[in-house]
C-alpha cells in the first residue's frame, strides 16, 4: 500500500485538517495521480504491470471504505466530516474519477450508503454533486462548447482530462441500453429495436431473441400513480393526454379509467401496433393513435398548433437521455401552461448514486425551459423479477416519480 492509500485509511483519529490535508496535497502535488489504484501500487511493489481492467480501487474508494459507520459509536464528528469533505474536494480537484468501480464492483456511493450514511448526508451529496458536474462537463465537451488549446505543453493535460472524463460517464437511458454490451444493438439502438421481433408473455413484453425487457408488470403501481399525475391539473371542460410508448398498455388502461376527453398514443413498433389493433385500441372513440416515432409525429402536431395536452407521459425502449433532451424542446410547445409532463424514471437506476445524479440533472435541465421537476419517492411493493429477462433495467428498491410543470 502506498503512502497515499495508507493516509486515506485514517490511521489516526480524530481526523484533523492539520494531520491529513497538507500531506494529501503534498503527495498529489508531487505527481502521484489521484486515480492511483491499490492494484497499481501492489503491482509496482511486485515489479509487475497491471492492466486497466484489473485496476479499479482508487484513493476515493479507500477513503470511503475507511469511514466509520454513521450509526456506530465511533461516527465522525462534525469537524471530522468537514475535513473529510476537504479531502474529497482535493482528490476531485486533482482529477479523481467519481464513477470508478472497485475490486468488488462497488461505487464510492455504494460504500458510503453501506456505512449507513443517509442520502441527504453531506458526504454522499458531495459524490452526487461530483457526478452531476462530470456529466454536465462531458456534455459540454461532446457538444463542442469547450475548445482545448492545441499546444504541445498541454498535450498531457488534455489527455488526462479526456481519460478522466471517459471514466466519469454515466449512460443515461430510459429503458434497454443500461449496461448493454456494445454488440447488443437491439437494446442500444432505436432503429434496430424497431426491426426486432417482440413477444408478449403473461407478465412482460420482451424482445423475442435477446429477451430484453421492454416493459414488465412490476411497473403497474408506478403507472397508476403516473396516470393520476397526468390528469391532476385537468381542465374543467376537457382533458387531453398523450402517452409516448404503448408497450403493454399499462398506463393507457389507467388513463382510460380517468375518463379523459382525448387520449393520444404514439407508438412506432409494428408488433406493438399489431397488438393494439388486436386488443381494440384503434377502435376506442376517444383514442388517437399516432403511428411512428415521436420525433416525427409530435413535430407534426407542433406544426399544426391545434392540439395541446393536460398531461404527457414518456416511456420508450432503447432511447437515451439525449433523446429526452430533444423531447423537452417539443414538450414545451405541446403542454398546456398548467399541464404535467412525466416519464418512466429509470435514469441511472442501475445503482442508487447514479439514480441520484440523474435526479438532479433532470431538475437542472428542465429548469432551462422554465419548468420545475418535483419527485415523489415510492417504496416499491413489488420488486422486479429478472429471472426470464436478459438484463435488469432497474436495481433500486424505491422509485423517484417525476412531475414536471411550468414554474
Curated annotation (Swiss-Prot):
Residue ranges annotated for the RMT2 domain, each copy included: 186-407
The family this protein is said to belong to: Belongs to the class I-like SAM-binding methyltransferase superfamily. RMT2 methyltransferase family.
GO molecular-function terms, A-Z: protein arginine N5-methyltransferase activity
Chloroplast is among the record's keywords: no
Protein name as catalogued: Protein arginine N-methyltransferase 2
InterPro entries assigned to the protein according to its UniProt record, in alphabetical order: Arginine_N-MeTrfase_2, RMT2/GAMT_Mtase, RMT2_dom, SAM-dependent_MTases_sf
Stored PROSITE patterns: SAM_RMT2
Binding site for S-adenosyl-L-methionine: 193, 223, 246-251, 267-269, 294-295, 315
GO biological processes: methylation
Sorted UniProt keywords: Cytoplasm, Methyltransferase, Nucleus, S-adenosyl-L-methionine, Transferase
Cellular component terms (Gene Ontology): cytoplasm; nucleus
Enzyme Commission number: 2.1.1.-
Superkingdom assignment: Eukaryota
Subunit field text: Monomer.
Purpose of the protein: S-adenosyl-L-methionine-dependent protein-arginine N-methyltransferase that methylates the delta-nitrogen atom of arginine residues to form N5-methylarginine (type IV) in target proteins. Monomethylates ribosomal protein L12.
Keyword Transmembrane belongs to the record: no
Cell location: Cytoplasm; Nucleus
